[in-house]
A protein has these predicted regions:
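Well-ordered alpha-helical segments embedded in enzymatic catalytic cores
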Residues: 12, 94-97, 139-142
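Conserved SAM-binding loop of SAM-dependent methyltransferases across substrates and taxa
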Residues: 10-22
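Short coil-to-beta-strand
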Residues: 108-116, 151
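Class I S-adenosyl-L-methionine
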Residues: 100-104, 119-205
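Conserved class I S-adenosyl-L-methionine
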Residues: 1-9, 106
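Glycine-rich phosphate-binding loop and adjoining beta1-alpha1-beta2 segment
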Residues: 20-107
Length: 205
């Protein structure tokens, strides 16, 4: 099964899906440094599957440069990383890049979660108005545009537990309304303790 990773960050979410046997179509991330990490991990997974992991190990030992590492991998693998900010200004370009990679295939899964600062308890506590004016509160609308366009069989929207209470729960209720009533998905929400799955974190998600 394939998947699209939105708000990909450095790719931690994707690592789990790849280990579970899913194939990435695209990782969309605005941060340049995070995209370098995504490309490096794409190179790792390709070289490992091709039996050429020695090239990756040479990179880890600084025996070859990052450019030399990338040169050992088909360009199509690295082109799965799309270094653009999700939003009105870039969505059409992102759609085009993803469409080209799909080549008329359907999308099985969309994963990802917008930046959590606007929803997190810590972020809201530090803000004079509880982050209510932060545009990141509404990035779930952009996420929904990808669901509407690609109609995946399922999706995983991940965020911090503070999403339940941000703006007295209004954002969360709007999100559920959009996913269920407008897009027609059966939605289940639940809290996961990351530490219960071998992660060195205390946050719940």
């Amino acid at each position: 099964m394939n998947y699209i990773d939105l708000f990909a960050g450095a790719g931690g979410f994707s690592e789990g899906f790849i280990k579970a046997g899913f194939t990435p179509v695209a990782h969309v991330e605005m941060d340049k440094a995070a995209c370098h990490t995504l490309r490096t991990r794409a190179a790792y997974h390709y070289l490992r599957s091709a039996g050429n992991i020695a090239i990756y190990i040479a990179y880890l030992k600084s025996e070859i440069t990052r450019d030399q590492l990338y040169a050992a991998v088909p360009a199509s693998e690295l082109q799965s990383i799309i270094n653009l900010a999700i939003g009105k200004a870039n969505n059409d370009k992102i759609f085009k890049l993803i469409d080209d990679r799909l080549n008329n295939r359907e999308v099985d899964v969309i994963i990802g979660g917008p930046p959590c600062q606007a929803y997190s308890l810590v972020g809201r506590a530090r803000s004079h108005n509880g982050m209510k004016d932060d545009d990141r509160n509404f990035l779930f609308i952009e996420y929904a545009k990808f669901l509407k366009r690609y109609k995946p069989k399922m999706f995983v929207f991940e965020n911090v537990v503070g999403l339940h209470s941000a703006n007295k729960g209004i954002y969360f209720r709007r999100m559920l309304l959009m996913f269920r009533n407008i897009l027609g998905y059966e939605v289940r929400d639940f809290i996961v303790a990351a530490k219960d799955f071998g992660c060195f974190r205390i946050e719940n998600e």
